Amino acid sequence: KAGQLNLLADPFRWMPTAVNPLDGTGDPARVTAMIREGKVGSLFNGIGAEAGRRIQQVAMEESRLKIPLLFAADVIHGLSTIFPVPLAEAAAFDTQLAYRTARAAAVETAASAVHQTYAPMVDVARDQRWGRNVEGAGEDVLLNNLLAAARVRGFQGDKGLDDRDAVLATAKHMAAYSAA
């Protein structure tokens, strides 16, 4: 059961030699075997709808516990359709815009067999040299709060996570990451 806590960077999607964090190689057969053995609970960066169905079938039909896998990705400012980065979007001071772009990204993400996004990024920018400032809404605490809430609603949909077009939003980097 503890294996279900393992999140692996997906070695199936981006390139055949993608890095497997367990052994430094891209080894889809090994990852598939680990899924069968119940040693993997989620894959990061998605694998596409067709491959997702196939690998989910392995988890559900060939593993002992039959627990479905969770597919996750960083959907910071879109998936197939790319929107302005959150920092640029924040310049509009428009929560409806943040909601609509997150909703559109969620529809594409869910259609790609991804269940969870590591977004929105909610760090308050404290140092303009920090390279990840573009993932958040800047230095204003209130604006960060309002836009993050709008993005969570957009990702998770009006009907909640039961909606087939919803993805689980995971706010990240909350503990002074940009101030470190």
Q: Which residue stretches match the model-derived regions?
A:
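Glycoside hydrolase catalytic-domain context in secreted enzymes
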Residues: 1-180
